[in-house]
């Protein structure tokens, strides 16, 4: 029996060692969340996506080199041959081609392009003539082509530059969203941290309450043995003990629940055992509401984001107007072509003949100037412009509303901080008085001046005051954190949090 007990104790010890507890301060929790949480990873991926979207459009202004290889390209098919004054015949034709093409395209700053291109391939041709009893003809040819081409849209906006501007605005918005997301993470970690702290303190308060009720029950039994109180008083004290045990068990379960929520919030494995370290001391600071509003309007990224959104809508208006504008295009090309054909399939001879033909054959060349204008579209273009302008006006209204909302939020949070600060001082004093009052009640109970039921009420009152102080403390800390988030300003140090967040 003793050996079994020893084994059980050893197993419990090993289990406890394996489940090492990680103690976290608030600063450590924030640091983990800003690197490991789902939210920051999601914001990072979104920012990376927009950054690459911007880099893609930026790269549109750089040259590109393209190569296509078709080796082999083979096909056989029936081809209809129409004959004058006779019925058509259907010949079977086939080709086997091997080669490729290479092109170099230089993007002009004006949105056009200048391209150099070359094509070279060898092809074996076959034809089965229906009119000659499907007599088979074969030929081998080599084809070479070198040329230059030019294309330039005119009388319209540079769409490449416009797309780049749009991508840049989108990237700036994603960067702002990432920065705001960091501040939101800090605030949410603050909420989660103090929610876990509340659950931890509730366990401690309920443990203290249970110890007090056990002590009251012990004293009641001694009084009963001395025949100083009735047995009913002891039963009441015993009921208080059992009720406090139930409350303690419930608060322990709630603490574990809050631990899991907090671990998920900051990005820790749910299997990891954690506990928090906090200092319940708090400091106060002066808040100038005018400075708070000024800094919020300067630092809050929602205003910049609204301005970027307005610029995107301006681009939409320009695009809508182009549906009905005069457009033009200039294109030109010049190339030389060489063709070598012979029955001998010798590749070297074929290409020598093709290269010689480059100088013999006249070049291909051309230039085209086109204009297009929608004369009448039955209101489609006009409606699209009206839609884009309405969305632009809505974006302007949204920016104005955001500025008003920021001012209102700052005024409200400044009031909340001041109110919670005063309330915290009151509850702190109440807690000191309640502790003193309960100690006096314990002495009165020991002296027989009050009943166990009256002592239980005093104990309940002490717990309520302790929880009220805890809630007031947490409310104040959350209000201060919300003030930081909504002003992006450190009132203690007199500096902007925006610089600190961007440096990270």
Model-assigned labels for residue ranges:
Residues 42-57, 181, 185-205, 222, ...:
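Amphipathic alpha-helical coiled-coil segments
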Residues 69-148, 277-286, 318, 331-373, ...:
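Small/polar, glycine/serine/threonine/aspartate-rich low-complexity segments that form flexible
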């Amino acid at each position: 029996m003793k050996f079994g007990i020893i084994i059980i104790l050893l197993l419990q010890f090993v289990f406890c060692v394996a489940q090492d507890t990680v103690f976290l301060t608030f600063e450590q929790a924030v640091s983990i969340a800003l690197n490991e949480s789902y939210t920051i990873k999601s914001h990072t991926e979104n920012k990376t996506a927009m950054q690459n979207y911007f880099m893609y459009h930026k790269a549109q202004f750089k040259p590109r080199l393209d190569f296509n290889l078709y080796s082999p390209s083979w096909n056989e098919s029936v081809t209809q041959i129409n004959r004058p004054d006779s019925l058509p015949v259907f010949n079977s034709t086939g080709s086997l081609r091997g080669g490729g093409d290479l092109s170099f395209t230089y993007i002009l700053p004006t949105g056009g392009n200048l391209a150099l291109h070359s094509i070279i391939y060898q092809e074996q041709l076959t034809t089965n003539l229906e009119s000659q009893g499907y007599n088979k003809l074969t030929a081998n040819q080599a084809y070479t082509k070198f040329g230059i081409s030019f294309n330039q849209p005119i009388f319209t906006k540079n769409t490449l530059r416009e797309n780049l501007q749009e991508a840049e605005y989108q990237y700036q918005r994603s960067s702002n969203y990432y920065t705001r997301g960091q501040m939101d993470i800090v605030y949410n970690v603050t909420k989660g941290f103090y929610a876990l702290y509340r659950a931890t303190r509730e366990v401690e308060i309920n443990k203290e309450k249970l110890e007090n009720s056990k002590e009251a029950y012990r004293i009641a039994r001694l009084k009963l043995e001395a025949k100083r109180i009735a047995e009913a008083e002891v039963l009441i004290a015993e009921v208080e003990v059992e009720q406090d045990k139930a409350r303690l068990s419930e608060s322990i379960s709630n603490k574990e629940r809050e631990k899991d929520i907090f671990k998920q919030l900051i990005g820790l494995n749910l299997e990891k055992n954690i506990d928090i370290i906090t200092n319940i001391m708090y400091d106060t600071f002066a808040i100038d509401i005018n400075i708070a509003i000024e800094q919020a309007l300067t630092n809050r990224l929602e205003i910049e984001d609204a301005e970027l959104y307005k610029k995107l809508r301006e681009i939409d208006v320009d695009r809508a107007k182009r549906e009905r504008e005069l457009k033009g295009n200039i294109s030109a090309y010049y190339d030389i072509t060489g063709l070598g054909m012979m029955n001998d399939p010798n590749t070297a001879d074929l290409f020598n003949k093709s290269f010689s033909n480059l100088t013999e054959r006249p070049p291909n060349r051309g230039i085209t100037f086109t204009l297009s204008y929608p004369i009448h579209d039955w209101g489609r273009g006009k409606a699209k412009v009206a839609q884009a302008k309405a969305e632009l006006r809505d974006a302007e209204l949204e920016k104005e509303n955001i500025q008003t909302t920021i001012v209102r939020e700052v005024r409200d949070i400044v009031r909340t901080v001041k109110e919670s600060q005063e309330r915290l001082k009151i509850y702190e004093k109440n807690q000191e008085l309640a502790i003193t009052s309960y100690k006096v009640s314990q002495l009165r109970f020991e002296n027989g001046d009050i009943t166990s039921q009256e002592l239980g009420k005093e104990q309940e009152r002490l717990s309520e005051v302790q929880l009220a102080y805890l809630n007031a403390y947490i409310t104040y800390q959350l209000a201060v954190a919300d003030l930081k988030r909504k002003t992006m300003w450190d009132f203690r140090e007199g500096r902007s949090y925006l610089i600190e967040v961007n440096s990270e």
